[in-house]
Swiss-Prot record:
Keywords of this entry: Developmental protein, Differentiation, Flowering, Nucleus, Repeat, RNA-binding, Transcription, Transcription regulation
Misc: While FCA requires both FY and FLD, FPA requires FLD but not FY to repress FLC.
Gene disruption: observed consequences: Late flowering.
Name of the coding gene: FPA
Descriptive protein name: Flowering time control protein FPA
Organism: Arabidopsis thaliana
All copies of domain SPOC, residue ranges: 441-537
Induction remark: Negative feedback mediated by FPA itself.
Region ranges (Disordered): 343-416, 655-736
Subcellular location, principal: nucleus
Length: 901
């Protein structure tokens, strides 16, 4: 037994009280048994029995009577058990008072006025025939002061005021309040006096006991409760006790109460936790209460605050027959097929008409759900695979927002940040409008592919530009705190809100709303164009971040994020793929993470770009390769076909020695693309057009090693075919270094259409692991070319994870003849022949210099850096050709020293 229930012992402290604690009671002991036994010693004000705990409290009017009963009945046998009697410990101070000994001349108003002097009263219940009242204060200090009324005379009698017993006695106070204080106790079992006391049912009566959880705030309002039950018959009185989580409803007859109980059991306000059972006690009369709803003076729940005016439903204007018209329009209606055994089937409630001549169907009204067939019920919507076992049955069912028929007009964008709607403020929309004139979408909201409810989308301000699909599927969730961080970097956002499209969708809509709120999450839905829509429940994110008035709605938010900075080489890699642009993000993201991306596909960022930027994604051999950029196209250096042909012609066809020279180091990285050429401009003797069409060729070296080459060929028009969609695989032969790039690789910059010059075969030696462009047959020694090593960060900046063959340093150039050289022969200097007919003067190679200086100026720092890297690439090629020509001129009169076979 609880500590607060332990009695005082008279022999310990000499304490005496008119309140007796009686213990060792059997579970079968009833209030009538105690009344019969203890009523012999005096008038009893109240008896409170706790059968499950084996004790009771008995309140005598006078202390002397309590003392006499204790001495006479100590150890008496009651229902086979010897009872123990002690003086009860005083009740702990609380906000609830019990007032007894009220004289017959004291009215309810007089008593309430007297006790209201001590503070604001939350609930006042006066039971005249029992000469008892129960008073609940908002503050405990007020109740402590009102306790001083104990023993004060009023109306010819002395008041007895005491605190109600903590929790348990407070729950069962109605058991005593309905007892006959003069000892003429009834023998009927009492109904449960709190929501937790629900254990069973009793015989049918015209009074219904409604037990509800604290979250069911609709039951606190007697007007709403009346409107929900009036369809079943004439209601004499309604009394709600919010602090005790139950209400009493008295019908005109027991038959009407039975119909109401059967029709609303588990379906009242769409809350299965609300329990309805009979009460054999009549609702206490309130002769001094002139209002029909005594509880209407209390403040209603604020669940309807800030809501616009509601259009009443077809059944809110009146009820046929003897039923009185509904008194308000803030009612709820649940009549959807979700709660029928067959979709579309109308409810089957029927009740006798007022004149008894026929049967009238009970129309669907506010707060009433159709009664499904016995044993049948649609399963709750759930998809554990996508939403971590989302079980609506585990959610705490709270109050439901009022739903109205007609269009969703009157919802003005109150307090929304102006940047959410672009430029300027948005004027408030009219409060009234034609039906369905303000919604921009009607469709289905789904969770993980499972339909949740039909809904309408209403814009706030300008709404969203993206067209919503027929089904908005929430495939993932995201934390609201993370969403707030993304909002901080967004350049704007678009806001809408969703409301149930039909009455039967309201339950599942609210359930989904409560689920997101309880998890502090927002649903993530991918739209058809790749835009991400966030479904945000009522939360602090709305009020603190979006500056939107918080209401019980599901909001849709689309963030406008700045486009990420895409490097040139990254854009080029995307353009080199055969898939369209809008598949890039899908291929990059895994299926589980695709719906979480906040950035739409990159095609959204180039909607206004020229047509050639998007057309470049299609592989073509007849158009030059173009590198897209987010900015406007810049005027860059363009090498004409004639100049490129000249550049190819000045490169000798045989291997010649070259001494180490000092060159300007390459200041930036270059983009590596895949090509292959033949030194004479043909592919194995074929015409260029035929060479374009050839597939991959397998070239074998002396060590019988092979690798893939692509038969791309230089054309007079100076055009390049699109590069392959992937890099050639590196060979596993130990003679190849991990950093080798095959002969089908060349340098390519952002805005130059560079043609292929000559083929570069494979090199089966680990001292030379990277080939540069050009068809020169003059090998350059390793120390000279090592000065042109690219920056170590170049591969990571351009391509992310880089294959091993792409991470090596640039070591030198070689020729077709280098295939058969051993390491010692290959490192030997090769001198070009003196009779090379197609050598050009040195100034031909210098022609590249003025063209390099003509590179266009970038509009941003990133583009300037790209242009500088591009210039460095061309500078490297020009310097390399210049050094080769210088060596040719210096050694033209000498004899070659160590020419290869």
């Amino acid at each position: 037994m609880a500590l607060s229930m332990k009695p005082f012992r008279a022999d310990d402290s000499g304490f005496q009280s008119n309140n007796l604690w009686v213990g060792s009671l059997t579970p079968e002991t009833t209030e009538s048994d105690l009344t019969e036994l203890f009523g012999r010693y005096g008038d009893i004000d109240r008896i409170t029995v706790y059968s499950s705990r084996g004790f009771a409290f008995i309140y005598y009017r006078h202390v002397e009577e309590a003392v006499a009963a204790k001495e006479a009945l100590q150890g008496a046998n009651l229902n086979g058990s010897q009872i123990k009697i002690e003086y009860a410990r005083p009740a702990k101070p609380c906000k609830s008072l019990w007032v007894g000994g009220i004289g017959p001349n004291v009215s309810k108003d007089d008593l309430e006025e007297e006790f209201s002097k001590f503070g604001k009263i939350e609930d006042f219940r006066f039971l005249r025939e029992r000469k008892t009242a129960f008073i609940d204060y908002y503050e405990m200090d007020d109740a402590l002061q009102a306790k001083s009324m104990n023993g004060k005379p009023m109306g010819g009698s002395f008041l007895r005021v005491d605190f109600l017993r903590s929790q348990a006695p407070k729950k069962e106070q109605w058991a005593g309040s309905y007892d006959n204080r003069n000892g003429n106790m009834n023998h009927k079992p009492q109904y449960p006096h709190s929501y937790e006391d629900f254990k069973g049912d009793v015989q049918p009566s015209k009074v219904l006991w409604i037990g509800f959880p604290p979250t069911a705030t609709q039951c606190n309002d007697e007007q709403i409760l009346h409107n929900a039950m009036i369809l079943f018959g004439e209601i004499e009185r309604v009394k709600s006790y919010p602090s005790r989580n139950f209400a009493l409803v008295e019908f005109r007859s027991a038959e009407e109460a039975r119909q109401c109980k059967e029709g609303l059991q588990g379906r009242l306000f769409n809350n299965p936790r609300i329990k309805i059972m009979y009460s054999n006690d009549e609702l206490p009369p309130e002769q001094d209460d002139t209002s029909f709803y005594s509880g209407m003076k209390r403040s209603r729940t604020d669940m309807f605050n800030n809501d616009p005016s509601f259009v009443s439903s077809p059944h809110s204007t009146g009820i046929p027959g003897s039923m009185r018209p509904l008194r308000g329009t803030n009612e709820r209606s649940y009549n959807g097929a979700e709660y029928n055994d067959v979709v579309g089937k109308e409810p089957n409630w029927r009740r006798p008409s007022a004149n008894g001549t026929g049967i009238l169907p009970s129309p669907t009204g506010p707060g009433i759900l159709p009664s499904p067939a016995q044993g049948t019920r649609r399963p709750m919507r759930s998809n554990p695979d996508s939403w971590e076992g989302y079980d609506p049955a585990q959610l705490v069912r709270e109050s439901k927002r009022t739903r109205r028929d007609g269009s969703v007009d009157g919802f003005t964008p109150m307090g929304v940040d102006e940047r959410s709607f672009g430029r300027g403020s948005v004027a408030a929309r009219p409060i009234r409008g034609p039906p369905d004139s303000d919604h921009i979408w009607r469709g289905m909201i789904a969770k993980g592919g499972t339909p949740v409810c039909c809904a309408r989308c209403v814009p706030m301000g300008k709404g969203i530009e993206t067209k919503l699909p027929e089904v908005v599927n929430c495939s993932a969730r995201t934390d609201l705190n993370m969403l707030a961080k993304h909002y901080a970097v967004a350049i704007g956002c678009e806001i809408v809100f969703f409301v149930p499209d039909r009455e039967e969708d309201f339950a599942s809509y609210t359930e989904f709303l409560r689920y997101l709120s309880s998890k502090d999450r927002a649903g993530v839905a991918k739209l058809d164009d790749g835009t991400t829509l966030f479904l945000v429940p009522p939360s602090d994110f709305l009020t603190d971040v979006l500056q939107v008035t918080r209401q019980e709605r599901l909001y849709g938010v689309v963030l406008k994020l700045p486009p990420p900075a895409v490097p040139v080489t990254a854009s080029y890699r995307q353009e080199s793929q055969s898939n369209p642009l809008h598949y890039m993000d899908q291929a990059r993201d895994s299926p589980a993470n695709a719906s979480h991306s906040l950035y739409p596909p990159r095609e959204n960022y180039i909607r206004g770009a020229p047509e050639h930027l998007t057309a470049a994604s299609k592989p073509s051999v007849s158009e030059p390769l173009r590198i897209p950029n987010n900015a406007a196209p810049q005027a860059g250096v363009s090498l004409t076909p004639e100049l490129l042909a000249t550049l190819a012609s000045i490169l000798p066809a045989t291997s010649q020695p070259a001494a180490p020279e000092s060159h300007q180091p390459m200041s930036g990285p270059s983009t590596v693309v895949s090509t292959a050429h033949q030194s004479n401009g043909l592919y194995n003797g074929e015409a260029p057009s035929q060479a374009w069409k050839r597939g991959p060729q397998t070239v074998h070296d002396a060590s019988n090693q092979s690798f893939q080459q692509y038969g791309n060929q230089y054309t007079p028009a100076g055009q390049l075919p699109p590069p392959p969609s992937r890099y050639p695989p590196a060979s596993n032969n130990p003679n190849y270094t991990s950093g080798m790039v095959h002969g089908n690789m060349q340098y390519q910059s952002q805005s130059v259409n560079m043609p292929q010059l000559s083929p570069l075969p494979n090199m089966p030696h680990n001292n030379y692991s990277m080939y540069t462009q050009g068809s020169s047959n003059h090998p350059v020694s390793q120390p000279m070319v090592q000065q042109y090593q690219p920056e170590a960060s170049m591969p990571n900046q351009n391509y992310g994870p880089i294959p091993s063959y792409q991470q090596a340093n640039f070591h030198g150039v070689t020729t077709n003849q280098a295939q058969n050289l051993n390491p010692s022969q290959f490192q030997a200097a090769m001198q070009p022949p003196a009779d090379k007919a197609n050598l050009e003067p040195q100034n031909q190679a210098l022609r590249l210099q003025p063209m390099i200086s003509g590179d266009g100026q970038g509009t941003t720092d990133g583009e300037v850096d790209k242009n500088q890297r591009y210039q460095s690439t061309l500078q490297f090629a020009a310097n390399l050709l210049l050094q080769i020509q210088q060596k040719q001129q210096q050694q033209s009169s000498g004899t070659p020293a160590g020419q290869g076979p």
